[in-house]
Amino acid sequence: IKQKKHHTLIENLRQKSHAGLILFSTGTTGRPKAILHDMTLFLERFQTPRPTLKMINFLLFDHIGGINTLLHTIFNRGVVVAPIDRNVDSILQTCAKYKVEVLPTTPTFLRLMLLSGSVPSKIPNCLKIITYGTERMDQSTLDALCNLLPNIDFRQTYGMSELGIVRVKSKARNSLYMKIGGEGVETKIDNKVLKIRSKTRMLGYLNAESPFNKNGWYDTKDIVDERDGYIKITGRTVDVINVGGLKFMASE
Protein backbone atom coordinates (compact mmCIF):
# COMPACT_ATOMS: atom_id res chain seq x y z
CA ILE A 1 0.00 0.00 0.00
CA LYS A 2 1.53 3.27 -1.09
CA GLN A 3 0.95 6.03 1.44
CA LYS A 4 2.64 9.07 2.83
CA LYS A 5 5.06 8.45 5.68
CA HIS A 6 2.56 9.79 8.20
CA HIS A 7 -1.09 8.87 7.70
CA THR A 8 -3.55 11.20 9.40
CA LEU A 9 -5.63 8.38 10.93
CA ILE A 10 -2.55 6.68 12.37
CA GLU A 11 -1.21 9.96 13.70
CA ASN A 12 -4.51 10.57 15.47
CA LEU A 13 -4.16 7.20 17.20
CA ARG A 14 -0.62 8.02 18.27
CA GLN A 15 -1.72 11.32 19.77
CA LYS A 16 -4.30 9.45 21.86
CA SER A 17 -1.76 6.73 22.78
CA HIS A 18 -4.22 4.16 21.47
CA ALA A 19 -3.29 0.91 19.74
CA GLY A 20 -4.64 0.22 16.27
CA LEU A 21 -5.83 -2.86 14.40
CA ILE A 22 -5.44 -3.10 10.62
CA LEU A 23 -7.54 -5.59 8.67
CA PHE A 24 -7.48 -6.11 4.91
CA SER A 25 -10.43 -6.68 2.61
CA THR A 26 -10.20 -9.47 0.04
CA GLY A 27 -9.82 -7.00 -2.83
CA THR A 28 -12.37 -8.83 -5.00
CA THR A 29 -13.95 -5.67 -6.35
CA GLY A 30 -10.65 -3.78 -6.62
CA ARG A 31 -7.40 -3.45 -4.72
CA PRO A 32 -7.48 -4.65 -1.09
CA LYS A 33 -8.54 -1.98 1.39
CA ALA A 34 -6.60 -1.44 4.62
CA ILE A 35 -9.19 -1.07 7.40
CA LEU A 36 -8.02 0.75 10.53
CA HIS A 37 -9.72 0.28 13.91
CA ASP A 38 -9.03 2.06 17.17
CA MET A 39 -8.42 -0.89 19.50
CA THR A 40 -9.78 1.04 22.49
CA LEU A 41 -13.13 1.44 20.71
CA PHE A 42 -12.94 -2.03 19.18
CA LEU A 43 -12.59 -3.67 22.60
CA GLU A 44 -15.46 -1.70 24.13
CA ARG A 45 -17.98 -4.19 22.76
CA PHE A 46 -16.44 -6.87 24.96
CA GLN A 47 -16.62 -4.89 28.21
CA THR A 48 -20.16 -6.02 29.04
CA PRO A 49 -19.87 -9.42 30.78
CA ARG A 50 -21.74 -12.19 28.98
CA PRO A 51 -22.12 -15.92 29.53
CA THR A 52 -19.50 -17.89 27.68
CA LEU A 53 -19.18 -21.51 26.64
CA LYS A 54 -16.20 -23.48 25.38
CA MET A 55 -15.73 -22.45 21.74
CA ILE A 56 -13.65 -23.60 18.79
CA ASN A 57 -11.94 -20.90 16.71
CA PHE A 58 -13.13 -22.22 13.33
CA LEU A 59 -12.77 -18.84 11.61
CA LEU A 60 -9.16 -17.71 11.26
CA PHE A 61 -7.61 -14.51 12.58
CA ASP A 62 -7.52 -12.92 9.13
CA HIS A 63 -11.31 -12.78 9.47
CA ILE A 64 -13.22 -10.41 11.75
CA GLY A 65 -15.31 -13.36 12.93
CA GLY A 66 -12.25 -15.27 14.12
CA ILE A 67 -10.97 -12.26 16.06
CA ASN A 68 -14.42 -11.79 17.60
CA THR A 69 -14.57 -15.43 18.76
CA LEU A 70 -11.19 -15.18 20.47
CA LEU A 71 -11.76 -11.83 22.18
CA HIS A 72 -15.32 -12.63 23.29
CA THR A 73 -14.15 -15.85 24.92
CA ILE A 74 -11.07 -14.37 26.58
CA PHE A 75 -12.89 -11.32 27.94
CA ASN A 76 -15.51 -13.58 29.50
CA ARG A 77 -12.89 -15.95 30.94
CA GLY A 78 -13.89 -18.81 28.72
CA VAL A 79 -11.91 -21.47 26.88
CA VAL A 80 -11.17 -21.29 23.16
CA VAL A 81 -9.91 -24.31 21.20
CA ALA A 82 -7.65 -23.86 18.16
CA PRO A 83 -8.31 -26.54 15.50
CA ILE A 84 -5.45 -28.29 13.71
CA ASP A 85 -7.43 -28.60 10.49
CA ARG A 86 -10.72 -27.19 9.23
CA ASN A 87 -12.18 -30.18 7.38
CA VAL A 88 -15.41 -31.74 8.65
CA ASP A 89 -13.92 -34.84 10.31
CA SER A 90 -11.14 -32.92 12.04
CA ILE A 91 -13.45 -30.20 13.37
CA LEU A 92 -15.97 -32.70 14.75
CA GLN A 93 -13.24 -34.84 16.31
CA THR A 94 -11.69 -31.77 17.94
CA CYS A 95 -15.08 -30.70 19.28
CA ALA A 96 -15.59 -34.15 20.80
CA LYS A 97 -12.07 -34.40 22.23
CA TYR A 98 -12.16 -31.04 24.01
CA LYS A 99 -15.92 -31.02 24.75
CA VAL A 100 -16.54 -27.90 22.68
CA GLU A 101 -19.97 -26.37 23.29
CA VAL A 102 -20.11 -23.70 20.56
CA LEU A 103 -19.13 -24.12 16.90
CA PRO A 104 -18.98 -20.76 15.04
CA THR A 105 -18.84 -21.60 11.35
CA THR A 106 -20.15 -20.87 7.84
CA PRO A 107 -23.09 -22.14 5.78
CA THR A 108 -20.60 -23.68 3.34
CA PHE A 109 -19.06 -25.79 6.12
CA LEU A 110 -22.51 -26.84 7.33
CA ARG A 111 -23.47 -27.96 3.81
CA LEU A 112 -20.26 -30.00 3.62
CA MET A 113 -21.07 -31.47 7.03
CA LEU A 114 -24.46 -32.63 5.73
CA LEU A 115 -22.98 -34.04 2.52
CA SER A 116 -20.29 -35.93 4.44
CA GLY A 117 -22.87 -38.08 6.20
CA SER A 118 -21.62 -36.95 9.60
CA VAL A 119 -25.03 -35.66 10.66
CA PRO A 120 -26.30 -36.75 13.09
CA SER A 121 -24.15 -39.79 13.96
CA LYS A 122 -20.79 -38.00 14.32
CA ILE A 123 -22.03 -34.82 15.97
CA PRO A 124 -20.69 -34.80 19.56
CA ASN A 125 -23.24 -34.55 22.36
CA CYS A 126 -21.26 -31.69 23.94
CA LEU A 127 -22.25 -29.26 21.15
CA LYS A 128 -25.00 -26.92 22.33
CA ILE A 129 -24.87 -24.06 19.82
CA ILE A 130 -23.85 -23.74 16.17
CA THR A 131 -23.58 -20.20 14.81
CA TYR A 132 -23.32 -19.41 11.12
CA GLY A 133 -22.35 -16.28 9.24
CA THR A 134 -19.98 -14.66 6.67
CA GLU A 135 -22.37 -15.61 3.82
CA ARG A 136 -26.07 -16.24 3.16
CA MET A 137 -27.63 -19.41 4.52
CA ASP A 138 -30.31 -21.21 2.51
CA GLN A 139 -33.53 -22.32 4.21
CA SER A 140 -33.32 -25.95 3.05
CA THR A 141 -29.92 -26.45 4.69
CA LEU A 142 -31.07 -24.84 7.93
CA ASP A 143 -34.25 -26.95 7.96
CA ALA A 144 -32.27 -30.16 7.44
CA LEU A 145 -29.87 -29.32 10.26
CA CYS A 146 -32.65 -28.36 12.67
CA ASN A 147 -34.53 -31.59 11.94
CA LEU A 148 -31.47 -33.83 12.31
CA LEU A 149 -30.05 -32.02 15.36
CA PRO A 150 -33.07 -31.08 17.51
CA ASN A 151 -30.99 -30.48 20.65
CA ILE A 152 -28.65 -27.91 19.08
CA ASP A 153 -29.52 -24.22 18.91
CA PHE A 154 -28.73 -22.63 15.54
CA ARG A 155 -28.01 -18.90 15.57
CA GLN A 156 -27.19 -16.49 12.77
CA THR A 157 -24.34 -13.99 13.09
CA TYR A 158 -23.67 -10.80 11.15
CA GLY A 159 -20.74 -8.45 10.79
CA MET A 160 -18.12 -6.96 8.52
CA SER A 161 -14.59 -5.69 8.91
CA GLU A 162 -15.66 -2.04 8.66
CA LEU A 163 -18.16 -2.36 11.52
CA GLY A 164 -17.05 -5.40 13.48
CA ILE A 165 -19.49 -8.02 14.76
CA VAL A 166 -22.87 -6.68 15.82
CA ARG A 167 -25.31 -8.40 18.16
CA VAL A 168 -27.90 -10.57 16.43
CA LYS A 169 -31.08 -12.22 17.68
CA SER A 170 -32.54 -14.95 15.47
CA LYS A 171 -36.34 -15.09 15.33
CA ALA A 172 -36.15 -18.87 15.84
CA ARG A 173 -33.53 -21.61 15.49
CA ASN A 174 -34.99 -22.57 12.10
CA SER A 175 -35.56 -19.01 10.86
CA LEU A 176 -33.35 -16.83 8.68
CA TYR A 177 -35.02 -13.69 10.05
CA MET A 178 -33.02 -11.80 12.65
CA LYS A 179 -32.73 -8.54 14.57
CA ILE A 180 -29.45 -6.61 14.38
CA GLY A 181 -28.37 -4.21 17.11
CA GLY A 182 -26.35 -4.04 20.29
CA GLU A 183 -24.63 -1.33 22.27
CA GLY A 184 -24.03 1.74 20.11
CA VAL A 185 -25.47 0.14 16.95
CA GLU A 186 -28.30 1.62 14.87
CA THR A 187 -29.92 0.18 11.76
CA LYS A 188 -32.25 1.44 9.05
CA ILE A 189 -33.57 0.15 5.75
CA ASP A 190 -33.37 2.43 2.73
CA ASN A 191 -35.03 1.10 -0.44
CA LYS A 192 -34.73 -2.46 0.96
CA VAL A 193 -30.98 -2.00 1.57
CA LEU A 194 -29.63 -2.36 5.11
CA LYS A 195 -27.59 0.52 6.51
CA ILE A 196 -25.79 0.50 9.86
CA ARG A 197 -24.31 3.15 12.13
CA SER A 198 -21.97 2.00 14.90
CA LYS A 199 -19.98 3.78 17.59
CA THR A 200 -17.25 1.13 17.38
CA ARG A 201 -16.84 1.27 13.61
CA MET A 202 -13.47 1.53 11.89
CA LEU A 203 -11.71 4.89 11.77
CA GLY A 204 -11.45 4.59 8.01
CA TYR A 205 -9.52 3.09 5.11
CA LEU A 206 -5.81 3.83 4.88
CA ASN A 207 -5.87 3.66 1.08
CA ALA A 208 -9.41 4.59 0.03
CA GLU A 209 -12.15 7.13 0.62
CA SER A 210 -14.44 6.75 3.62
CA PRO A 211 -17.54 4.59 2.92
CA PHE A 212 -19.61 6.41 5.56
CA ASN A 213 -22.00 9.20 4.64
CA LYS A 214 -21.96 12.57 6.41
CA ASN A 215 -24.22 11.20 9.17
CA GLY A 216 -22.05 8.15 9.77
CA TRP A 217 -24.23 5.54 8.05
CA TYR A 218 -22.60 2.58 6.28
CA ASP A 219 -24.24 1.01 3.23
CA THR A 220 -23.91 -2.77 3.72
CA LYS A 221 -25.21 -3.42 0.18
CA ASP A 222 -27.31 -6.22 1.66
CA ILE A 223 -30.86 -6.38 0.30
CA VAL A 224 -33.28 -7.36 3.06
CA ASP A 225 -36.89 -8.39 3.57
CA GLU A 226 -38.47 -7.00 6.74
CA ARG A 227 -41.25 -8.68 8.70
CA ASP A 228 -42.47 -7.79 12.19
CA GLY A 229 -39.23 -6.03 13.09
CA TYR A 230 -37.02 -8.88 11.84
CA ILE A 231 -34.99 -8.86 8.63
CA LYS A 232 -33.76 -11.55 6.24
CA ILE A 233 -30.94 -11.00 3.77
CA THR A 234 -32.17 -11.85 0.28
CA GLY A 235 -29.35 -10.60 -1.94
CA ARG A 236 -26.70 -8.02 -2.69
CA THR A 237 -26.72 -4.79 -4.66
CA VAL A 238 -23.32 -5.71 -6.12
CA ASP A 239 -22.49 -8.72 -8.28
CA VAL A 240 -20.33 -10.58 -5.76
CA ILE A 241 -20.61 -14.24 -4.75
CA ASN A 242 -19.65 -15.14 -1.16
CA VAL A 243 -18.41 -18.70 -0.52
CA GLY A 244 -17.30 -19.58 2.98
CA GLY A 245 -16.51 -15.95 3.70
CA LEU A 246 -14.35 -15.60 0.56
CA LYS A 247 -15.73 -13.26 -2.09
CA PHE A 248 -15.63 -13.81 -5.87
CA MET A 249 -16.99 -11.90 -8.83
CA ALA A 250 -19.72 -13.75 -10.73
CA SER A 251 -17.43 -13.88 -13.76
CA GLU A 252 -14.95 -15.98 -11.77
Give the ranges of each region predicted by the language model:
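Gly/Ser/Thr-rich phosphate-binding loop
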Residues: 102-104, 115-174
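Conserved ATP/PPi-binding loop(s) of AMP-dependent carboxylate-activating enzymes
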Residues: 180, 188-216, 230, 236, ...
